[in-house]
Amino acid sequence: MSAPGGPLARLEARLTREWQRRGALAWALTPFACVFGLCAALRRTAYAQGWKQPMDVGVPVVVVGNVTVGGTGKTPTVIALVDALRAAGFTPGVVSRGYGANVKAPTAVTPASRAGAAGDEPLLIARRTGAPVWVCPDRVAAAQALRAAHPDVDVIVSDDGLQHYRLARTVELVVFDHRLGGNGFLLPAGPLREPLSRHRDATLVNDPYSGALPPWPDTYALALTPGAAWHLDQPALRRPLSQFAHERVLAAAGIGAPERFFATLRAAGLAPATRALPDHYAFADNPFVDDAFDAILITEKDAVKLGASWRDARLWVVPVEAALDPRLIALVVEKLRGRSPA
C-alpha cells in the first residue's frame, strides 16, 4: 500500500479527475477501453446465452454492486439491507471477496476477526449486523460454505460481485455516488466496468451535494447520515458531531471516495482539515503522529484496521447509516418471495 501522498495515491487522484471529463488522456485510452469492453461483453454474453451456467446456491441472492470503479456507499447499503431483510422476516447472510485479505478458501468472518485476514468491509459488516459473513474470491464457494455452516440462512447478500456472473442472483442493486458514470467511458479511459445501460433491478444514488436523481428507471435516493462519533479507545464514549465544531479537527479517510466522507462532515456543520488516504490503507504506522489537531475523525472502515496497539486519544470514529427507500425494500422483498435464483 502506498504511503499517504505517495506515487500510487497521486496516480489514483489524477485518474479520478480525468475520469470525470473527456480530456486528452481519456481519448488516448479509448482503444484500450474498446478491448476491455469487448472482453466484458463476451463474458456477459457467455452467461446470457447459456454457454456458461451460473451456480444456484439454493437460496435467493441479492447482489449490491456498482458499474464504476471506486467507493459509492455499498458497504453501508449492505448493512442497511441486511437489517431491512431481517425486519421483513428473513435470515440473511453475507458473502464478499475479502478485498485486501490473504484469503484463498472460504473463510468465516466474525466480529473478532482481524481486518488483514478478513478484509475491512466484511469485518465491518460482521460487527455491525451480527449476520454470518463469509469471504472468498470465489463467491459461489463462499455462499456454499456459508449455507453449510448456517442452514437457517434463507437469503444471501453479496457485497459487490456484480460482475461475478458465476453466482446466480435474484436481485441486482447498483449503487452510484454523485459522480454517476463520470465521462461515460469504460476502463481505463473512464470509471465504468460496464456500460451505464447494463440491466439491473434498481439503482441507488448517493449524492450528498445536490440530492438530484438521474432520469433512470427504478432509481432511488440513498441517504448516508453520520451518527455520534465514538472514541477509538473507549467505544462507549460518544460525542455528537456538533461538539467538534470549535476544535481543531482533521478528517481522514482511506476509502474509495474520501471526499464523500468529508462532505458528510461539512453537512453536519464542521469545517475540518482533510486528508485522503489510499483506499484500503493498511495503517502500518500512525500517519497522524506529527499532526497538531485536537481531534481526528475517521471512518468505521478505517477503524476496524486499528488494533489495540493504537494509542492516540485524538481518534474518533464516525459511523454512517444508510437510509433505504421503503419502496426499494418492498421491491426487493417482493422479488425474493416471488422468484427463484436465475
Swiss-Prot record:
Entry EC number(s): 2.7.1.130
GO CC terms of this entry: plasma membrane
Catalytic activity reported: a lipid A disaccharide + ATP = a lipid IVA + ADP + H(+)
Positions bound to ATP: 68-75
Enzyme class per UniProt: transferase
GO biological process: lipid A biosynthetic process; lipopolysaccharide core region biosynthetic process
Family statement: Belongs to the LpxK family.
Stored PANTHER family: TETRAACYLDISACCHARIDE 4'-KINASE, TETRAACYLDISACCHARIDE 4'-KINASE, MITOCHONDRIAL-RELATED
Biological role stated in the UniProt entry: Transfers the gamma-phosphate of ATP to the 4'-position of a tetraacyldisaccharide 1-phosphate intermediate (termed DS-1-P) to form tetraacyldisaccharide 1,4'-bis-phosphate (lipid IVA).
Protein name as it appears in the record: Tetraacyldisaccharide 4'-kinase
